[in-house]
Amino acid sequence: MNYELIFLAAGQGKRMNAEKNKMWLDLVGEPIFIHALRPFLADNRCSKVIVVCQETERKHVRKLMQQLDVAEDRVEVVKGGSERQYSVAAGLECCGLESVVLVHDGARPFVTLDIIDRLLLGVKQNKAAICAVQVKDTVKRVIHDVVKETVDRDNLWQIQTPQAFELHILQKAHRLAKKDQFLGTDEASLVERIPYPVAIVQGSYYNIKLTTPEDMPLAKAILGELGGKVND
């Protein structure tokens, strides 16, 4: 099953305490987002990559794609929005080559082809699928610094990206969100409102999102554990 990829690289460095877009921070010799993009570039089923980035970085991204020998007709670089949801919407405007679209965070550098395989199977069976891992820690609901209850974690999952959808479903979800002025935290939260059932497939505890400075040493350790290869 072929697919198009909306690759989100328009992030900022506020929580990372970085002076530049965290996507460009170095992770063992390469920008974070290049590690996140490589598995898709290595996947022949990925027919088109839409990189959504800041306007000021579009030229740099195009140059980097050339250095990676990515075919010019395989990648499109577009301007992102002020919110993640608006960036995905900008990417959706460039889709239409395939019936399936994946959305991935450029700040998740440890996605694997195994995860992509499971997602494509999930979207084939359910039309909407996201990867996730079950919550390990005890979770408590807290109000005004006081514990109100301990939440049953048996049905709690930490949601990751990529997330996969039939294109028409994600387009419909975005149209409804725009109409209702709803702002979600991920694509699945929009699709759930249609409403449409979203299937879960197994992600990886390695598939972390790099958000704060504490994440960088962990990322280097994960990369070392994986032998510098995250494509397998």
Curated annotation (Swiss-Prot):
Family listed: Belongs to the IspD/TarI cytidylyltransferase family. IspD subfamily.
Keywords: Isoprene biosynthesis, Nucleotidyltransferase, Transferase
PROSITE patterns linked: ISPD (PS01295)
Natural source organism: Listeria innocua serovar 6a (strain ATCC BAA-680 / CLIP 11262)
Annotated site location: Transition state stabilizer: R15, K22
Pathway: Isoprenoid biosynthesis; isopentenyl diphosphate biosynthesis via DXP pathway; isopentenyl diphosphate from 1-deoxy-D-xylulose 5-phosphate: step 2/6
This enzyme's EC code(s): 2.7.7.60
Entries under Pfam families matching the protein: IspD
GO annotation, biological process: isopentenyl diphosphate biosynthetic process, methylerythritol 4-phosphate pathway
The organism's place on the tree of life at top rank: Bacteria
InterPro entries: IspD (IPR001228), IspD/TarI (IPR034683), IspD/TarI_cytidylyltransf_bact (IPR050088), ISPD_synthase_CS (IPR018294), Nucleotide-diphossugar_trans (IPR029044)
Annotated site, Positions MEP for the nucleophilic attack, chain positions: R153, K209
Protein task: Catalyzes the formation of 4-diphosphocytidyl-2-C-methyl-D-erythritol from CTP and 2-C-methyl-D-erythritol 4-phosphate (MEP).
One GO MF term attached to the UniProt entry: 2-C-methyl-D-erythritol 4-phosphate cytidylyltransferase activity
Stated name of the protein: 2-C-methyl-D-erythritol 4-phosphate cytidylyltransferase
Reaction(s) catalysed by this chain's protein: 2-C-methyl-D-erythritol 4-phosphate + CTP + H(+) = 4-CDP-2-C-methyl-D-erythritol + diphosphate
